[in-house]
Amino acid sequence: MEKEAAKRRVEQLHALINKYNYEYHTLDDPSVPDSEYDKLMKELIALEEEHPDLKTPDSPSQRVGGAVLDAFQKVQHKTPMLSLGNAFNEEDLRDFDRRVRQAVGDVEYNVEFKIDGLAVSLRYENGVFVRGATRGDGTTGEDITENLKTIRNIPLRMKRDLSIEVRGEAFMPKRSFELLNKARIERDEEPFANPRNAAAGSLRQLDPKIAAKRNLDIFVYSIAELDEMGVETQSQGLDFLDELGFKTNHERKKCSTIEEVIEIVEELKTKRADLPYEIDGIVIKVDSLDQQEELGFTAKSPRWAIAYKFPAEEVVTTLLDIELSVGRTGAVTPTAILEPVKVAGTTVQRASLHNEDLIKEKDIRLLDKVVVKKAGDIIPEVVNVLVEQRTGKEKEFNMPKECPECGSELVRIEGEVALRCINPECPAQIREGLIHFVSRNAMNIDGLGERVITQLFREDLVHNVADLYKLTREQLINLERMGEKSTDNLLNSIEKSKKNSLERLLFGLGIRFIGAKAAKTLAMHFETLDKLKKATKEELIEVDEIGDKMADALVTYFEKEEILKLLDELEELGVNTVYKGPKKAAAEASDSYFAGKTIVLTGKLSEMSRNDAKAEIEALGGKITGSVSKKTDLVIAGEAAGSKLAKAEDLNIEVWDEARLISELKK
């Protein structure tokens, strides 16, 4: 076939295959038999092989799986992919409703299924799917584009040429899971514990052809730029996603009172067992986007949504032993070793016992019959003992007086429940501290997980965090399961971590009571490690959210000579000790136009993102709110501004366009 004719036919085939694909996988209403679909796909692949330049990224042929990858690249999300706060009972839902109504008044809620899968983001440029990523830590995920292309419900080209980031939950249907596990058992392979693990494992395959065989599915539930799309509610946003050709879950309801929400939750709960996919709860969202913006976010989750989690499944098994582990702060934690038992779809052999007091309070003994559940359907825990089933063979358990790792005396610090090893040279504490230092929310050194750290420690190659930056290629390549490529990738990752902003280093150091949020607050305030090291307790407690306990821990930490020596060594090795994030509002912000003003952003900005505009205005002393009122000083209106612009005009509030905003920001 000649080139022009081939081009026209390829375009026709794209349109036909995409249409049939949408009918079959999204509408569940096919208009042609499978044989016709297969014939068209075969013709398209043949034409693309004959004319390789006609193969485009949005071609339906690209769903079969591309080349094998060496590793997953990191991807920065346009806006954070936060997790949701949890509700476990009716009272939790009522508390959520009270908080929402106190903040914004009357509301409507959108109630949706919480799909039990893997949260993903889908990036489209001019209507074409260009990148897909996992949630990761909420800010940065992993690029799994080629694997996501194998999910036939993800349109490779939308029905409109928009540039947006769509959020959804990829999952494995129950039937696909059963067939996959049946095939794995027949091949003498370990079956997956549950559909969620199977979906996550499939999407993290370096070979997309494996993912293509797994018959994954997806429901999408939001657009990162939803408020720029001219829609005003979450429910309108879902309808808009339907119009664009995405698959949304139609098991959703709107309601205006918490009583209605609770009724709907109970109704939807009864459908769980009969669904063709797994759900692990119900999501309740404030429907109005204006009210969502007004409610805002905590560090971890939106204030305008909550996930009702189903009551955990409980089972009975035998407690065989109690194992002790020493954490990075020296706390000794007991863990129950159980006779293997299935709980919520996974085999459980270990469960948390938290501390000595809990063991005594519940009178837990070795060989007891115990009730086990998964807290929040994730972490197994021992609920209680079936005392009536005791046979007399059970044995009492007593916590040791010495550290199980180093033999030092264990102490209980006043006001705490945990027994602690206070030996700073305890090998378990050092090892756990190293694992924490390289973790995702700390220095984020990809490829340097628990297994490699344990090997390095066992081979006497690392004794503290500074030693990680002295590792050589020769040392790493000799470790188990470390080839040339993985060694080079790890060295690159270690080198890259030197450029991290100060808050990651602070969190990674594992200072008592200093979590990721406090580390960010301290880094923003003091801006350099040198200033923080010299801060007095009085200066520390002046910082927002830093209390006496944190201040004391920081002063004690930075008084230690060995710590100061370690920090100096890290600096000499090239590790950054300066805050690189957005600066707190500078003193000169008081001279800016925005200082002290209440400002509303609405519509789509073309020269900068809404998040960037918000950050810059706040850095100059402005306060961004989600709704227009008499207290609003300024409305900045982009394209498709909608009701907020109309309300601003009604109230005679000053309105700027994007050009005026950029002009003011440049001053």
From Swiss-Prot:
Gene3D superfamilies: 5' to 3' exonuclease, C-terminal subdomain, 6.20.10.30, BRCT domain, DNA ligase/mRNA capping enzyme, Helix hairpin bin, Nucleic acid-binding proteins
PROSITE patterns: BRCT (PS50172), DNA_LIGASE_N1 (PS01055), DNA_LIGASE_N2 (PS01056)
SUPFAM superfamilies xref list: BRCT domain (SSF52113), DNA ligase/mRNA capping enzyme, catalytic domain (SSF56091), Nucleic acid-binding proteins (SSF50249), RuvA domain 2-like (SSF47781)
Keywords: DNA damage, DNA repair, DNA replication, Ligase, Magnesium, Manganese, Metal-binding, NAD, Zinc
Domain BRCT: 589-667
GO-annotated biological processes: DNA repair; DNA replication
Cofactor(s) needed: Mg(2+); Mn(2+)
DNA damage recorded as keyword: yes
Pfam families: BRCT (PF00533), DNA_ligase_aden (PF01653), DNA_ligase_OB (PF03120), DNA_ligase_ZBD (PF03119), HHH_2 (PF12826)
Catalytic activity of the protein: NAD(+) + (deoxyribonucleotide)n-3'-hydroxyl + 5'-phospho-(deoxyribonucleotide)m = (deoxyribonucleotide)n+m + AMP + beta-nicotinamide D-nucleotide
EC assignment: 6.5.1.2
Positions in coiled-coil regions: none
Annotated positions binding NAD(+): D34, S35, E36, Y37, D38, S83, L84, E112, R135, E169, K285, K309
Xref: NCBIfam families: dnlj (TIGR00575), PRK07956.1 (NF005932)
Cross-referenced PANTHER family: CHROMOSOME TRANSMISSION FIDELITY FACTOR 18 (PTHR23389), DNA LIGASE (PTHR23389:SF9)
Entry similarity comment: Belongs to the NAD-dependent DNA ligase family. LigA subfamily.
Its job: DNA ligase that catalyzes the formation of phosphodiester linkages between 5'-phosphoryl and 3'-hydroxyl groups in double-stranded DNA using NAD as a coenzyme and as the energy source for the reaction. It is essential for DNA replication and repair of damaged DNA.
Protein name: DNA ligase
Species this protein is from: Bacillus licheniformis (strain ATCC 14580 / DSM 13 / JCM 2505 / CCUG 7422 / NBRC 12200 / NCIMB 9375 / NCTC 10341 / NRRL NRS-1264 / Gibson 46)
